[in-house]
Amino acid sequence: PSVPKVKRFFQEMHFLSLLKELPLDIVALKKNYCLVNDLESLEQLLKKLEKETKICIDTETTHVHPMLAQLVGIGFGIQPGHAWYVSLNGFLSKEVILEKIKPLLEKKEMGFVGHNIKYDLHVLKNENISLQSIHFDTILASYLLHPNTQRHSLDELSLQRLGREKIPIESLIGKGKKQISMLDVPLDLIKDYCCEDVDCTLQLKEQLETEL
């Protein structure tokens, strides 16, 4: 049988470990991920985002629990294949960046998309930023469509639905005694990791929204 047919069967049967053995889609590898690390590129990004009505976001932090997490950066996207990572741990101060992006994030007319966006909402709230309108959450959509499975993580959904094996978090921070903080990870690595999250979330949103 052809690879696409085998892939489709594995996806339908939720054979995630077998999906990893198949060759990746060439189309899925085409991407444009940008690091926003200076005032000029930040202002250009905000101009672009302010024209939109829906934006995908993803926060990168130092902890899985939002109340213990320190915000490291924020990913933005408006269409699959394109994403931006705004670093809060680069050349610009965290205070300057948050002051610049706060009006966009608190815009009532803006609908935000995310995966488990409740986490991002809490993390941003810790920085005195309140998202006003949640448009779509891919983890909730997946749960509504498949309530009898526990496989709703972004990694699992990306592999099952997109045939895409995401960058594992362990490749950035390690694990066990050798684990490091996200604050110590090189910006280019976090950029690729976060932008991939945004990209996959947008692709999953397109699929899940049509199925609901």
Where are these predicted regions, by residue range?
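Long, highly charged low-complexity segments
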Residues: 2-74, 88-104
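Short acidic alpha-helix initiation/capping motifs at coil-to-helix transition points
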Residues: 1-2, 149
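Active-site-proximal helix-loop-helix substrate-binding element of RNase H-like nuclease domains
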Residues: 65, 69-212
